[in-house]
Amino acid sequence: MRLLLAAAIAVALLGTAQATAGLSDAEVIVAYCRKAAPALAGKGVPVEDRTPVGMCVGYISGLADAFQHLCATSHLKGRLPLEQRKGIASVTANPENQSYASIISSFIKFADENPDLLDITPTPLLLQRALQQEFPCNIPKE
């Protein structure tokens, strides 16, 4: 019985490691987010795509929420460099136009327009650039 339990735990951990192995890899997140397109359009998601869709929505919404927090605290002088504050503030520039669906769509669009950045840019920075392009926000210089 103990051997069976140990084997089940090992298999579960292996699956978790494989599912999260590439979260910092922009190409992986973009691929997951492409599978989310039907869900974002209000259509169903095939059973086999539910995990990647959940990973996309969870990852992107977590980053967007973190960016909003950073934007709210970035008014403190010297807290963040100006260019970084502009990208982060983009998340809250036009809240009426933003939803996780629009943020994910902007992320996919930016990735499609800049495929050369996918293998050299960390995912959070890629999302920041996508948001800055789609939802520009001007922050006065210090």
Where are these regions (language model features)?
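N-terminal signal peptide c-region/cleavage motif recognized by signal peptidases
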Residues: 14-19
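Short N-proximal segments of mature Sec-exported proteins
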Residues: 26-105
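Short, structural beta-strand-to-alpha-helix junction motif
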Residues: 21-29, 99, 121-122, 126
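Amphipathic alpha-helical segments in well-ordered regions
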Residues: 62-66, 110, 130, 134
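Helix-rich interaction surfaces within compact, conserved domain-sized segments
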Residues: 100-111, 115, 127
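C-terminal partner/receptor-binding element of secreted or periplasmic proteins
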Residues: 117-142
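Sec-dependent signal peptide recognition
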Residues: 1-8
